[in-house]
């Protein structure tokens, strides 16, 4: 909505982009943007005694597309835990029924994010062939702005180009694919490993050979990193590393992060990192097996802290019954063999795959308890909160609706100790982790960095989201927390972040007292790299379709305009 | 002990979701407050008072509250669902999910019930004087954790999918059953006093099934091991004893594999 003038008066403003930490200030809004001032007739929102932040930015969440939908089909029982399905208020406002807990319906996804004051969510893995489906679901998710990252790490074209280190061709293919899939950036999932899965194999180390393609995960990662900077995309490569979830995987993690050393970020969007390493919790384990499984969060963060051109997100385990789903097909099969619960696998032609398995993270199961501690430790060992973002790798480590709980644990040692004290293996958990000895409690400014300014900058979207400076989109969340007198009871922190007192999306009040008022005006963001065509790449792509390597024709491959009817296109001029 | 009487006044146009009709919800409330309790009819939130007249107040706790529905509830779902104590008596029929997820207390339906009666039940007792449709005491769709405890007794016959994924408790069907009994079960006991068409104990890991009538088509995964005399729900008889499902994984106890047991009355 535009036009209406609003002024948010008297709140404790927290905006790391302007280094504002709890100052009592007014925020003025006009035509959907934040402005310096508004007239005296502006609608007044009284935020006195409340915290005012920018709308949240989620850098990594699986919320739309065939994988999520396969999860919904696999787990009808997830709907038993929907919570409030149909409140009378909802009915009055004419909005749609909500269902699901770990794999909520598109409507619940939009509403729940809005209730938590989130303005932007990145769908973390889009199979390009299935991009039309991803965009249809994104379009049906109300309120929040979204974008999607196509997966490249096991793509046959990419592997063919990179085995000869053809960076320019790789970049041209990326540019083409981002355009036709209306994608945002370069996602890499288990580089080489998912392709190897077609042969029943996996790549657990950086120098493992991908069968048939004669390439290694390391070559895929460095090649895509170079291509990404060649194009100057708003976001860096977004990496789910090899050997996820296994004991003793942290050296592979650090080796992968080291590939960023000496690489410079080249873009016009204010992004400083060249690699975003996602759900780092799943990659920060020591031990030789499940018996000696332990946290290596400190070792991993010691490296992250000194290497300034990487960013990370946590992937915190929230100790819930959830649904794991990833393009890391071999990992999901491995997980199914561990927990014997139902499993499904999807293969996406030349591009990627996906696996889905329900998972119950129990505080009384030692490895799960260690995972819980590891996720929180990553944040508590971090020195630069603007490079460390809160996620649960929704729904893999827990549903996104648990962000408020993660925030509570990070802000309050007592609440962490309370969970620890109820664990069956408390002493063993304390031995295998650092959580018990860490006294650090994050403050609201740091939380705002981790959920707002930081991820917006890492995505190259700091000119739209993540702050409250004039000119930015008027996405403002107001939480019922007194900055000067924070509650002694940690539960009140969680409750405040779960249901915002107000949430304004693009200058429109979409949530009041934790209840959704309107479907808002969502946008789909995609990146349009303007790179000169390379005839060889054009020929390779059209030949592949012509020969029938895909099951669809090239004219049916792109995402049509009508599937993303509210686009916001970010043009990138590629200077070769 | 207090008794709240609900008398149906109107047949719902759509099915009425009577999830508030439990001793737990009625406890500590007056008749007027009970009439205000919510229930959905389609997407619309209605009140119990829209479909019933309410007389009598709830007891102090669920255990002190009896609910008597003096009439037919063919179009009312979720009666007694999730209740923990007390009792519910329905004079006529009831729709789906009677006593679903219940933990304690007793539900008595004098007519028939529709599907999902006692789904994922954990404790307490359900008695149906008429017949039941499908999915008696089974797991929710997709879930692998079925009925854990309690007793369901159906005096008439039942449809298919009885006790799917059952982990504990007892289901007694006094009449005939169609197909799929104790599929995927890892515990619990099912007694069928009539005949079963087939698919008894498919993929069953642990637990007991007694069939006092005939099984028309046996599952190939069951092997006859001996003939035993047993007393089952007051009936003494000689049974052919089968173990199975041999195609399924089975846990070991003291070095020996534990199988599910199927007892079929010797003819």
Can you name each region flagged by the protein language model?
Chain A
Residues 64, 129-131, 154-158, 193-197, ...:
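Flexible loop/turn segments at secondary-structure boundaries
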Residues 166-190, 194-388:
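Histidine/acidic residue-rich metal-binding segments in metalloenzymes
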Residues 56-66, 236-244:
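Histidine-centered catalytic micro-motifs
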Residues 7, 42-46, 146-148, 185, ...:
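Conserved beta-strand scaffold positions in the cores of enzyme catalytic domains, especially
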Residues 59-210, 558-575:
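Divalent-metal coordination cores built from histidine and acidic residues
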Residues 38-53:
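Active-site metal-binding motif and surrounding structural segment of the metallo-beta-lactamase
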Residues 1-25, 29-30, 39, 65, ...:
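Active-site microenvironment of metallo-dependent hydrolases
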Residues 53-60, 122-124, 278, 313, ...:
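Active-site neighborhood of phospho(di)ester-bond hydrolases with catalytic His/Asp-centered motifs
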């Amino acid at each position: 909505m535009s036009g209406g003038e609003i002024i948010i008066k008297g709140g404790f403003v927290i905006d790391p982009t302007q280094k504002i930490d709890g100052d009592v200030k007014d925020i003025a809004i006009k035509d959907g943007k934040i402005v310096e001032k508004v007239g005296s007739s502006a609608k007044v929102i009284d935020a006195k005694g409340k915290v005012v932040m920018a709308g949240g930015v989620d850098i990594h969440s699986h919320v739309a597309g065939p994988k999520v939908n396969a999860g919904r089909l696999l787990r009808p029982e997830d709907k038993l835990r929907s919570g409030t399905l149909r409140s009378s208020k909802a009915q009055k406002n004419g909005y749609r029924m909500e269902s699901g807990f770990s794999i909520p319906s598109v409507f619940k996804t939009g509403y729940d994010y809005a209730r938590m004051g989130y303005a932007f969510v990145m769908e973390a893995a889009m199979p390009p062939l299935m991009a039309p489906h991803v965009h249809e679901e994104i379009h049906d998710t109300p309120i929040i702005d979204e974008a999607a990252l196509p997966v490249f790490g096991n793509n046959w074209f990419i592997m063919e180009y990179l085995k000869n280190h053809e960076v320019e061709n790789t970049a041209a293919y990326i540019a083409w694919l981002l355009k036709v899939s209306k994608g945002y950036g370069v996602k890499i999932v288990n580089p080489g490993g998912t392709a190897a899965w077609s042969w029943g194999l996996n790549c657990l180390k950086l120098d493992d050979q991908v069968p048939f393609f004669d390439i290694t995960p390391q070559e895929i990662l460095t090649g895509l990193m170079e291509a990404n900077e060649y194009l100057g995309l708003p976001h860096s490569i977004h990496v789910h590393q090899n050997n996820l979830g296994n004991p003793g995987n942290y050296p592979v993690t650090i080796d992968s992060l080291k590939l960023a050393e000496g690489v410079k970020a080249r873009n016009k969007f204010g992004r400083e990192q060249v690699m975003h390493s996602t759900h780092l919790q799943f990659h920060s384990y020591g031990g030789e097996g499940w018996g000696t499984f332990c946290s290596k969060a400190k070792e991993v963060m010691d490296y992250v802290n000194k290497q300034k051109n990487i960013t990370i997100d946590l992937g915190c385990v929230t100790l819930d019954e959830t649904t794991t789903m990833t393009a890391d097909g071999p990992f999901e099969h491995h997980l199914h063999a561990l927990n014997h619960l139902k499993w499904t696998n999807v293969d996406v032609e030349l591009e990627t795959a996906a696996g889905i398995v329900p998972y119950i993270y129990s505080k009384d199961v030692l490895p799960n308890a260690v995972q819980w501690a590891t996720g929180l430790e990553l944040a508590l060992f971090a020195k630069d909160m603007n490079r460390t973002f809160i996620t649960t790798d929704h729904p893999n480590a827990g549903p996104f609706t648990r962000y408020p709980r993660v925030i509570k644990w990070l802000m309050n040692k007592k609440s962490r100790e309370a969970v620890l004290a109820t664990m069956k293996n408390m002493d063993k958990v304390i031995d295998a982790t650092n959580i018990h000895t860490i006294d650090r409690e994050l403050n609201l400014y740091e939380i705002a960095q981790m959920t707002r300014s930081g991820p917006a900058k890492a995505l190259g979207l700091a000119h739209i989201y993540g702050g409250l400076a004039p000119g930015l989109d008027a996405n403002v969340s107001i939480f019922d927390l007194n900055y000067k007198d924070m509650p002694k009871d940690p539960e009140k922190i969680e409750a405040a972040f779960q249901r915002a007192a107000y949430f304004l999306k693009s200058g429109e009040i979409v949530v009041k007292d934790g209840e959704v008022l309107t479907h808002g005006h969502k946008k789909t963001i995609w990146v349009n790299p303007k790179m000169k065509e390379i005839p060889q790449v054009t020929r390779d792509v059209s030949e592949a379709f012509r020969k029938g390597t895909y099951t669809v024709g090239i004219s049916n491959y792109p995402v049509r305009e009508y599937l993303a009817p509210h686009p916001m296109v970010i043009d990138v001029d590629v200077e070769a | 002990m207090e008794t709240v009487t609900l008398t149906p006044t109107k047949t719902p146009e759509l099915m009425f979701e009577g999830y508030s009709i439990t001793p737990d919800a009625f406890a500590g409330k007056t008749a007027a407050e009970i009439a205000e309790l919510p229930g959905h009819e389609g997407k619309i939130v209605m009140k119990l008072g829209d479909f019933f007249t309410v007389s009598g107040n709830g007891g102090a706790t669920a255990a002190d509250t009896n609910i008597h529905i003096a009439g037919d509830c063919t179009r009312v779902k979720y009666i007694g669902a999730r209740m923990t104590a007390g009792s519910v008596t329905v004079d006529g029929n009831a729709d789906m999910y009677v006593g679903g997820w219940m933990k304690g207390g007793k539900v008595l339906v004098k007519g028939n019930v529709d599907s999902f009666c006692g789904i994922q039940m954990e404790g307490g007792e359900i008695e149906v004087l008429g017949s039941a449709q499908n999915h008696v005491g089974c797991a929710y769709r997709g879930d692998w954790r079925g009925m854990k405890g309690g007793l369901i007794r159906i005096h008439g016959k039942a449809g298919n999918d009885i006790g799917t994924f059952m982990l504990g408790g007892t289901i007694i069907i006094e009449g005939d059953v169609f197909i799929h009994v104790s599929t995927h079960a890892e515990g619990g006991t099912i007694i069928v006093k009539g005949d079963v068409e087939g698919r008894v104990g498919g993929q069953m890991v642990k637990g007991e099934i007694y069939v006092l009538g005939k099984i028309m088509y046996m599952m190939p995964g069951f092997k006859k091991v001996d003939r035993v005399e047993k007393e089952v729900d007051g009936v003494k008889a000689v049974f052919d004893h089968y173990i199975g499902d041999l195609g399924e994984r089975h846990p070991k106890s003291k070095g020996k594999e534990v199988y599910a047991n199927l007892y079929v009355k010797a003819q």
